[in-house]
Structure formats: C-alpha cells, structure tokens
Amino acid sequence: MKDVYFMERDPYAPIRHCYGISKILYEGKSKYQEIQVVESHYFGKILILDGVVQFTEKNEFFYHEMLTHPVMFAHKNPQNVLIIGGGDGGILREVLKHKSVKKAVLVDIDKDVVEVSKKFFPTVACSMDDPRAIILNEDGFKYIQDYKNEFDVIIVDSTDPVGFAHVLTTEEFFKYVFEALKEDGIYVGQSESLHYHLDIVVRFQKALKKSFPIVDLYTTVIPVYAGYWWSFSVGSKVYNPREISREVDVETRFYSDEIHKNAFLPPNFYQKILNGNFKY
C-alpha cells in the first residue's frame, strides 16, 4: 500500500501526533478497546489502543525500563512482583531481568492485548513463557483486593486514566495497593505528562499521599507520548525511591544508576508543583 498517515486521538493532549505508516498489520476490537498494529518506516511496528500510541518498536525501551527499574533497584530484595496492566509484556520483561525475582504476576483485563503482543511484538512479549511469570486476564482493581502483605513491588502500567483504567488512579485503589504490599513494599505507576496533564499528576500524587508515608515523582522523555516529559509516581512504605539499594546489574539500553538519580525532580521544584505554584 502507499504511505498513509495515522493521526493519534489522545483525549488529554492539545496536539495530535501524525505517523506515516506503510502497512496496517492488525485491526480489531476487544471487549474493552480498539486495538491496532501498524508498520512505520521510522518507528517499526506500533501498538495503538483506542487511537492512542502505546509504544513503538524503535523506542519502547525508554518507557518500559523507566517504569520498572527505579523502584526495583530502590527495593533491597524484590522477590514477588505484581504488574497491573502491561499486557504487552514489556514491564514483565524488565522485571524478570532481576535475579532476585521469584514470581511476577501480570494482571491485564484484556486478553486480546496479550495475544496481539505475542504475535506482533515478540521482543516485548518475550518473557511471558518464563516459569516465574503468571499471566492472568482479570480486573486488576478487583484482583488486588484479595491480597494483604503479599508483594514486594507493585507496578501499574495502565492506559490513560479514562474508561476502565480510571479506577487505577483513585484513593481507594491506592489503599488496596498499600495493603497488598509487604511492610517494605513500593509502588509505581505512570502518571501522564507534566506539560499537558499537570493537574492529573498533582491529583495522582495527592491521592498516593493518603496511603503512603513516602511519595515521590520522577520523569523521563518519551518521544511518542504527547507532552514528551512523562512522569512516574512512586509510593513507598520504607525505601527512599531516590536511592539505589543494590548494584545495577541488569542489561539495559537506557536506565542506569546515573539516570536513576537524575530522573527525580529537585525537591524544591517538586514541592512547587504539589503546592500549585508551578504554572505556565
């Protein structure tokens, strides 16, 4: 087919990214969302959910590494990890790079995303057959309510906070997360862009503070996400997420100990954001 252009439908961004694509590899609709896989000359294959780009082959590692490794290395000995969302398998791949991990449970409500990723993104979904991995197609909000003092790390890799993903950003959900974590457990979730979604970031942080004694925020650049300057919100019971508790001994393309330390916002600027004094 001739080159055509796909225009993203991000419900929260004031801009629209447009991608030149050479081939449509898959189009379908699951019980929960529209799913597309397209081929781009520059980005390679692209996963799109409900009109919003989730990742591209070319640069998916920025997001998956940065959502995973800061909290995994903040924890001294992460053995049991829960991933809510992340049906593409990218976070699971990064979690299982840690030798300390004995069990990683991936709970994604949409089994079609899991199957599409296995078929079209084998380098992302490559750890789904690892014997330490448990893949469940369930509602993560309901699943977590059945567990107390169970997990060392909980990572939420959700889509934008609309529709069925909205409950994963609420005070009620974070209460369940806190209860499901062990006494030194730590949580992280993607919390949108500081450029275009500052109100969401602040709301996310304040909701976490209702349950967790230690709450923080770090960022990185995600080139394909509207706003680019992407945030990740951390809730911890004991560990300071700015500090690395173990040797960085996993193979990564972007994350490193230096990246970890520099990803967190300067404390004064962080407080300025939370206090509503950062406006532009």
Swiss-Prot record:
Source species, domain of life: Bacteria
Main location class: cytoplasm
Disulphides: none
Binding site for spermidine: H64, D88, D157, S158, T159, D160
Alphabetical UniProt keywords: Cytoplasm, Polyamine biosynthesis, Spermidine biosynthesis, Transferase
UniProt subcellular location: Cytoplasm
GO BP of this protein: spermidine biosynthetic process
EC id: 2.5.1.16
Active-site residues from the entry: D157 (proton acceptor)
Family: Belongs to the spermidine/spermine synthase family.
Name of the featured protein: Polyamine aminopropyltransferase
Species annotation: Hydrogenobaculum sp. (strain Y04AAS1)
Lineage of origin: Bacteria, Pseudomonadati, Aquificota, Aquificia, Aquificales
Gene from which the chain derives: speE
